[in-house]
Amino acid sequence: MKKQFLVRKNSSNSRYLRRDCVICLQKDGLRAQLSPCGHDQFDYSCICRWMDQSLTCPICKRHVDCVFYGFHGSSLYKKWYTQSLGSNQYSISRQLLRQPSFSSSENTDRLADLLRVRRFIYQKAWKSYENPSLSSHRQYQIPTPIQLASSASLLKKVESFIAKELLLFEYLDGHQINFIQIFLMGLLRVQNIQHPQTIDELAEFIGHEESSILLHELQRYLQFRPLSISSYLYSKRYLYGPEGLTMVQLLSQIENIQHESGPETENS
């Protein structure tokens, strides 16, 4: 990679993230930049764990040849090549995160688990329902378009949820994800989440069933408003499928299926 690619803007010399990492949605991480696509909205530990699952950019889906990190000024940085890690890509994060300067992130692990189980839920076309044993616990009202548009904190929660859910649709590239996110955020400022037309308009991009699930899950998410990725994944409020399983129980089931029959079974 040419040096000017890495230093095309003065701000790109920063060792730390300038914007929220698109994987964990936090801004306090160490920046990593991918080659050849150039995307750099990733925390280093996040992208290492992402590549345990796929050697492609989370934004544009292009194959990743090299990762740059540890930036110091305009010309000092570290890098590693994906091909140097051998054929077992599932060892990537274990190899790379041994470095003491990049400690493991529990939040990143939780996000990887969350994406895995969320993809399984969409494949099964399951919608969450409330755990009856927790029905007496506090619930928030689903915000109206006016309430949503006037609350920066609510907008942030909705934006974060939509961003994570759209990552599940592997046929969407980064530009498409960004466009759909902006489109849906604008739509929800003027139209109720539950409105049939909201589903119909989103369905033009990801399909009717998927749109129905996404908006239903967003609605449930806003009713309980978990504080973090971990609290969402570990919540006992959300149950799925005929057995009424939590996301953690589903994750355990997925891992057992893959251990016994191989990863292809997850898609059945």
Curated annotation (Swiss-Prot):
Molecular function terms, GO-annotated: SUMO ligase activity; ubiquitin protein ligase activity; zinc ion binding
RING-type Zn finger ranges: 21-61
Entry keyword set: Metal-binding, Mitochondrion, Nucleus, Zinc, Zinc-finger
Pfam families: zf-RING_2
Positions in coiled-coil regions: none
Disulfide pairings: none
Record keyword Zinc present: yes
Localization in the cell: Mitochondrion; Nucleus
GO cellular component terms listed in the entry, alphabetical order: mitochondrial outer membrane; nucleus
Key word Zinc present: yes
GO terms of biological process kind: proteasome-mediated ubiquitin-dependent protein catabolic process
Top-level taxon of the source organism: Eukaryota
SMART domains linked: RING (SM00184)
Protein name: Uncharacterized RING finger protein C16G5.03
